């Protein structure tokens, strides 16, 4: 995959997200090598937890941690790693870990991909239990890894998410 050829924005209101980890998959952390385009096993997670949403990144961006901007894509189905999915940002999970700030954009598929998310415009439109699962996952998925930790500091709205995306595009 030629990751560098994929733009961050599909259009003004849509972002491209490259999926690295499907929702509900085994406790394996995958990461794309941005130079080669190969999908590597980053590590086997020591907790027996699975990602509550599809997890990936926005290409052609750079976040404060030196990696592309991270995204959780809320969907009804797992998405195959390497797939590019057009999404709308609806908010952001604010968190930090042993390496510093590590925000996660929360997004939903565009109307063309799945009309069942058309009513989701912001975080408050998501099921409260899903938000609790997301927080629980990130608060605990590194619990058994020595020297690693996560602190969830709250949620940011759609405007905050769009600001982080724009900063990520500008930084790259």
UniProtKB/Swiss-Prot annotation:
SUPFAM superfamilies: Inorganic pyrophosphatase
InterPro entries reported for this sequence: Pyrophosphatase, Pyrophosphatase_sf
Residues involved in Mg(2+) 1 binding: 65, 70, 102
This protein's UniProt keywords: Cytoplasm, Hydrolase, Magnesium, Metal-binding
UniProt-listed Enzyme Commission number(s): 3.6.1.1
Any single Pfam family the record assigns to this protein: Pyrophosphatase
Ranges annotated as spanning the membrane: none
Cofactor(s), names only, from the UniProt record: Mg(2+)
Residues reported in the UniProt entry to bind substrate: 29, 43, 55, 141
Keyword Aminoacyl-tRNA synthetase: no
Known partners and oligomeric status: Homohexamer.
HAMAP family, per database record: Inorganic_PPase
General function of this protein: Catalyzes the hydrolysis of inorganic pyrophosphate (PPi) forming two phosphate ions.
Protein name: Inorganic pyrophosphatase
Organism whose genome encodes this protein: Rickettsia prowazekii (strain Madrid E)
Designated gene of the protein: ppa
């Amino acid at each position: 995959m030629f990751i560098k050829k994929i733009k961050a924005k599909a259009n003004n209101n849509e972002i491209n997200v490259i999926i690295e980890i499907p929702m509900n998959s085994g406790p394996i952390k995958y990461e794309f090598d941005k130079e080669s385009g190969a999908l590597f096993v980053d590590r086997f997670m020591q907790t027996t937890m699975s990602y509550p949403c599809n997890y990936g990144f926005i290409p052609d961006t750079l976040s404060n941690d030196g990696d592309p901007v991270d995204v959780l894509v809320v969907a009804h189905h797992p998405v195959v790693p390497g797939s590019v999915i057009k999404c709308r940002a609806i908010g952001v999970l604010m968190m930090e870990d042993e390496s510093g700030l590590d925000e996660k954009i929360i997004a939903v598929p565009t109307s063309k991909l799945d009309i069942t998310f058309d009513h989701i415009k912001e975080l408050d439109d998501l099921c409260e239990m899903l938000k609790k699962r997301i927080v629980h996952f990130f608060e605990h998925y590194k619990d058994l890894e020595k020297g690693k930790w996560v602190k969830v500091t709250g949620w940011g709205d759609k405007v905050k998410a769009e600001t982080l995306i724009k900063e990520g595009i500008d930084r790259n």
